[in-house]
């Protein structure tokens, strides 16, 4: 017997379905459900008097017989590949299926079997995304990891050894000894971690040593001397050992100009950090490299998006991060050369048209580790308000823009760094590193963060209360952050060469060491999902005006942003 429900009543009970629209936080971004994998009238839902009960939505199937470990019911998936309603089955710490959950003995079309051994996470009215990846981390303090996790980041890649001055300025873990200590420390944290070695050397020996020591990538930084010789040497080692290279170019143009850097790269794949230039790089025209087919350009979040306060805060940040002195005129000139409103404004637009591919943090080194998602969606909102709908959109929604922007901190950094076989998207077979969001708090404050299918973090009320919700409610580590569950639910990424050289046996760490792969000639700008545009970029050396394919790129700074003070009263 059929039963008719209004759309509002259905959405309140089972979450939105095809044709329904959802607003993301307090932005002007609206998504529309494209497909519903569940079956109307056969939805599964947990609770008193609900469907997932013995003999109803719960079968007798054992785990060995095919029942999943966890089912997330009626979730709204937001990923680069689609915006869909589905049940999500998790097994062995991975996504086992996306489809229709239930009891195959009583329901048709079941692709996710719910059994007595299945836990339920209620996804009705929630958005589920892949865990974010922050690919520009200065490992200055371990407390960053908690901050990132609670914001929805489940993988952090970068370099450092703590608050050493090299780490305060550069994302490098120099030498195999320091890399080993950081890999050992990784066991203590509920986070997928990956470490970058220092790439600044004119001879390959020391770089090879770091790759064999476990570095997943090599970082070229101007503070260590990013000369053409160092660039060429570093990329040659990377090509031999299949690791990525990240570059922060020469702001002062001492060893060459942007043309010389492009020539030294020789068409090889490279990830260009803070390609706009405020974070560092050839002044004033490093932004030109975002038009190169072999360059994967990224932003760090202090310039995301361009606001009335952006320029004012950057000078002091830069002086601290790069060990500069306000009493030395040359240091002040160095800092001021990097901060240009024209290129920062252009950066907004280049993100919106898909010419910049990645957004990351630059944690504690001119960036905020807990604001990768927030700054990404603030940029998307600002661009919609200023530029209107994208030409790629169809229907009365912002689905394409949302897919473009979520790719910037999920799948694209994963592809760039050889991790997309494990993380970066919500797809069958990948790690179950997932984030649940209430749409009202989307991008700002997660409802729950899973690592390897285990709940690692969530907001939680007073532990002595009779129910979980009484104040004070704040983020707390969950069971996935403790004991062996911590080391089993997350991994440390390393180079394949280091595993072949016996790194796991030498270090004896508890976490699994997983190799990066396909970081070199197999990828490039064209591999960046929804963010692969390569326009011809020109920068006026006098006015700093930026043009893409002849069109002036400029926009006004925002004076008000969504996802800001409204969400952070306390």
UniProtKB/Swiss-Prot annotation:
Its EC number is 3.5.1.5. Gene3D superfamilies: Metal-dependent hydrolases (3.20.20.140), Urease, subunit C, domain 1 (2.30.40.10). GO terms for cellular component: cytoplasm. Residues 131-570 form the Urease domain. It catalyses: urea + 2 H2O + H(+) = hydrogencarbonate + 2 NH4(+). Ni(2+) 2 binds at residues 219, 248, 274. It is found in: Cytoplasm. Transmembrane segments: none annotated. This is Urease subunit alpha. It comes from Sinorhizobium medicae (strain WSM419) (Ensifer medicae). GO terms for molecular function: nickel cation binding; urease activity. Its cofactor is Ni cation. Ni(2+) 1 binds at residues 136, 138, 219, 362. HAMAP family: Urease_alpha. Belongs to the metallo-dependent hydrolases superfamily. Urease alpha subunit family.
């Amino acid at each position: 017997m059929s039963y008719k429900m209004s759309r509002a009543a259905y959405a309140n009970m089972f979450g939105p379905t095809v044709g329904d629209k959802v607003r993301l936080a307090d932005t002007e971004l609206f998504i529309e459900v494209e497909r519903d994998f569940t079956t109307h009238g056969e939805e599964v839902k947990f609770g008193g008097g609900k469907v997932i009960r013995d003999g109803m939505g719960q079968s007798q199937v054992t785990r060995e017989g095919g029942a999943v470990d966890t089912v997330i019911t009626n979730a709204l998936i937001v990923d680069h590949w689609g915006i869909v309603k589905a049940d999500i089955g998790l097994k062995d710490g991975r996504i086992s299926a996306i489809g229709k959950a239930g009891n195959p003995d009583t329901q048709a079309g079941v692709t996710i079997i719910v059994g007595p051994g299945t836990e339920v996470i209620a996804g009705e009215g929630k958005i589920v995304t892949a865990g974010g990846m922050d690919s520009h981390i200065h490992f200055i303090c371990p407390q960053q990891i908690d901050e990132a996790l609670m914001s929805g980041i489940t993988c952090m890649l970068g370099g450092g050894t703590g608050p050493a001055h090299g780490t305060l300025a550069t994302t490098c873990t120099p030498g195999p000894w320091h890399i080993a200590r950081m890999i050992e420390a990784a066991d203590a944290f509920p986070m997928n971690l990956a470490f970058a070695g220092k790439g600044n050397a004119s001879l390959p020996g020391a770089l090879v040593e770091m790759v064999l020591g476990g570095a997943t990538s090599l970082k070229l930084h101007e503070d260590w001397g990013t000369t053409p010789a160092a660039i060429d040497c570093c990329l040659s080692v990377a090509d031999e050992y299949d690791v990525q290279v990240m570059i922060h170019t020469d702001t002062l143009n001492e060893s060459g100009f942007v043309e010389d850097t492009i020539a030294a790269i020789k068409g090889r794949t490279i990830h260009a950090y803070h390609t706009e230039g405020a974070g560092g790089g050839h002044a004033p025209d490093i932004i030109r490299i975002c038009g190169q087919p072999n360059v994967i350009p990224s932003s760090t979040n202090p310039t995301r998006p361009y606001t009335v306060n952006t320029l004012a805060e950057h000078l002091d940040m830069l002086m601290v991060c790069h060990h500069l002195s306000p009493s030395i005129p040359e240091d002040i000139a160095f800092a001021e050369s990097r901060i240009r409103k024209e290129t920062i404004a252009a950066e907004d637009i280049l993100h919106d048209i898909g010419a910049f591919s990645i957004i990351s943090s630059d944690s504690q080194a001119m960036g905020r580790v807990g604001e990768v998602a927030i700054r990404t969606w603030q940029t998307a909102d600002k661009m919609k308000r200023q530029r209107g709908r994208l030409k790629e959109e169809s229907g009365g929604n912002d689905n394409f823009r949302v897919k473009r922007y979520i790719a910037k901190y999920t799948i694209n950094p994963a592809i760039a760094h050889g991790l997309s076989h494990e993380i970066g998207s919500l797809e069958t077979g990948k790690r179950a590193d997932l984030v649940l969001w209430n749409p009202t708090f989307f991008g700002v404050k997660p409802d729950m963060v899973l690592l390897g299918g285990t709940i690692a973090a969530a907001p939680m009320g007073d532990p002595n209360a009779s129910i979980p919700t009484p104040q004070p409610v704040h983020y707390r580590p969950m069971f996935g952050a403790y004991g062996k569950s911590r080391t089993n639910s997350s991994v440390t990424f390393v180079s394949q060469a280091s595993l072949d050289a016996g790194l796991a046996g030498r270090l004896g760490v508890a976490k699994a060491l997983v190799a990066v792969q396909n970081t070199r000639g197999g990828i490039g700008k064209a591999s960046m999902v929804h963010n692969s545009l390569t326009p011809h970029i020109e920068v006026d050396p006098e006015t700093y005006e930026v043009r893409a394919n002849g069109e002036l790129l400029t926009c006004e700074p925002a004076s008000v942003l969504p996802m800001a003070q409204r969400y952070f009263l306390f």
